[in-house]
């Protein structure tokens, strides 16, 4: 009986260990992604069930600014982030020494000009005030938009990170107010024109197609990307995220929900 009792105890231990291993195999791995709320947080929540089916529990960590998601990624607080275009990422890597990289482009958020005072950029009065993002990538993008509209002319060689100091010709003597990208929509009551990133426009109920007075060219190089730490580009979790975000389901959602405010590039 003593031998049989010892055998039964060992059998129970082995059974428990086997069940523990099986349960561990069935437990989904956590996939943490940093994002801005609209549209990125919404799109991520849309694909959560698809990632669950691939064995990942998606956790979305939302930020209201453009800096924190990259800091969190570099500090290994999240697995990936999804909120920024490639020029912004490149500038962050260069200026902050971050060890992060782009994995895949997902969509374009057309930048646009909005106003409560005029109906067209042609109606800008002399000395008009224009608010633009204060980071180099998005501020430069806003100035390039104004140049494409014929409102200003930039110096030769001034590219994606142009600043108001790079303006060569400003016939209407426009005055520029530089604020954090997330705060630009809040300046609409105080300026003649605000140049707003679409994610922040959508967040306050503005649609780039319906509500703007000038829209960025459709050939924009500013595709929003999934980013990860250097060396993690082939991480199965990161690849699963890219697969989920580039599905027909997501493309249909972007087109039908945002009506031109979010343009898929896959």
Description of each model-found segment:
Residues 110-121, 223-235:
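A bilobed periplasmic-binding-protein/Venus flytrap-type ligand-binding module shared by bacterial periplasmic
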Residues 74-84, 128, 151, 172-174, ...:
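Alpha-to-beta junction loops
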Residues 138-147, 245-265:
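Periplasmic-binding protein-like
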Residues 66-97, 112, 119, 142, ...:
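Pocket-flanking alpha-helical
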Residues 60-71, 158-186:
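Short helix-initiation/N-cap motifs at beta->coil->alpha
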Residues 91-103, 118, 190, 195, ...:
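Ligand-binding "clamshell"
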Residues 37-59:
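Short, polar/charged alpha-helical segment
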Residues 103-153, 251:
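A conserved helix-loop-strand patch within extracytoplasmic ligand-binding domains
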């Amino acid at each position: 009986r003593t031998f049989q009792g010892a055998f039964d105890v060992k059998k129970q231990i082995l059974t428990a260990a086997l069940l523990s291993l099986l349960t561990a195999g069935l437990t989904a791995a956590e996939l943490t992604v940093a994002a801005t709320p609209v549209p990125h947080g919404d799109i991520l929540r849309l694909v959560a069930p698809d990632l669950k089916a691939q064995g990942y529990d998606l956790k979305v960590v939302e930020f209201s600014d453009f800096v924190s998601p990259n800091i969190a990624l570099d500090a290994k607080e999240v697995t990936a982030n999804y909120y920024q275009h490639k020029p912004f990422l490149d500038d962050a890597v260069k200026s902050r020494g971050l060890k992060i990289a782009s994995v895949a482009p997902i969509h374009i958020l057309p930048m646009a000009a909005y106003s409560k005072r005029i109906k067209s950029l042609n109606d800008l009065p002399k000395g008009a005030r224009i608010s633009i993002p204060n980071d180099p990538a998005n501020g430069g993008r806003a100035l390039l938009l104004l140049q494409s509209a014929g409102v200003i002319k930039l110096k030769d060689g001034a590219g994606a990170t142009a600043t108001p100091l790079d303006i060569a010709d400003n016939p209407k003597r426009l005055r520029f107010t530089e604020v954090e990208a997330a705060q630009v929509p809040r300046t609409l009551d105080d300026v003649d024109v605000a140049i707003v990133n679409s994610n922040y426009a959508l967040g306050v109920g503005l649609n780039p197609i319906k509500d703007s007075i000038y829209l960025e060219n459709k050939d924009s190089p500013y595709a929003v990307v999934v980013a990860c730490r250097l060396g993690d580009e082939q991480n199965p979790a990161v690849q699963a995220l890219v697969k989920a975000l580039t599905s027909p389901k997501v493309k249909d959602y972007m087109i039908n929900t945002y009506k031109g405010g979010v343009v898929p590039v896959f």
